[in-house]
Amino acid sequence: MSKLVSMREAIAELAPDGVSVALGLQMEQMIPFAAGHEIIRQKKRGLTLIGPISDILFDQVIAAGCAERVIAAWVGNVMMGSAYNFRRGVEQGSLKAVNLTNFSLALALQAAAMGVPFLPTRTALGSDVARDNDFFAEIESPFADTQISESAARPGGRGRPPLREHAKLHAVKALSPDLTVVHVQRADRDGNAHCWGNFGVLIEGVRAAKRVLVVAEEIVDADVISSDPNRTVIPGFLVNAVVECRYGAHPSPVQGYYGRDNAFFRQYHEHTKTQGESEAWLQRWVYDVADRRAYMNQFGGCRVEDLAVKQHAYAAQTEFGY
């Protein structure tokens, strides 16, 4: 059964007020800006935003008044530094920020994907990340007196130094988003999706979520997806809806399709320093455009063409036969 719907239908159905939404799981690339803009257009409220490095998408959703909480490792403009709306919200108390690291966020999502309440780590020990943070709990290792075997040698004949299980650990609480939105290169109508490049925590975020929306640069026949199973990182049975949206990740890059629009990130930084400027920016780039096609039309054909991939780098052909 086809899961292909419009962006308007997908957001209306899958993102009611008050839910937690994971966005921008692939770090600086393939951030689902088109989906985020539809969330803004539909004036969703009370959202919790989840993501490692969301770049400026979180800042836009915050500026529109859609979010009340952020669970992230970093929020800002990767190119320029501060995200003014996020900063204003935290300083004024209208936005709650829960601080995780990239790795601890990955652990939280992975725990939910595995169906376990937490995963252990040592990486937060000695830092203040876990202080007054409900996502961390100090625990004792049940194997504290066990010495790990050093029989496995490293390449070159050098033995691994003996390791002992540290008694003190941090448990990172599982995190299951109500909705995970991901942008991929291509998918079929059933939601089976090809993706390549930097995954970030894409796979963990999809498997941890209660519902999944896949946004694809193009919808292709199922035969195209099945011809390359190793790129099918999202199986259709996990997906609730799929949307075709060309340039849906702009201004972030999509490997093999278009590059990062650095000028747009600079312009956003320059024109959103105040609340009034941010509202004017949203009016021009979100509220006054009906969909992604209208959004891209504002740039003109030359600007869009400049973003298209010029230097191609193809993978070697793969033989899947036996």
Name what the model sees in each region:
Residues 1-322:
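Conserved alpha/beta enzyme-core scaffold
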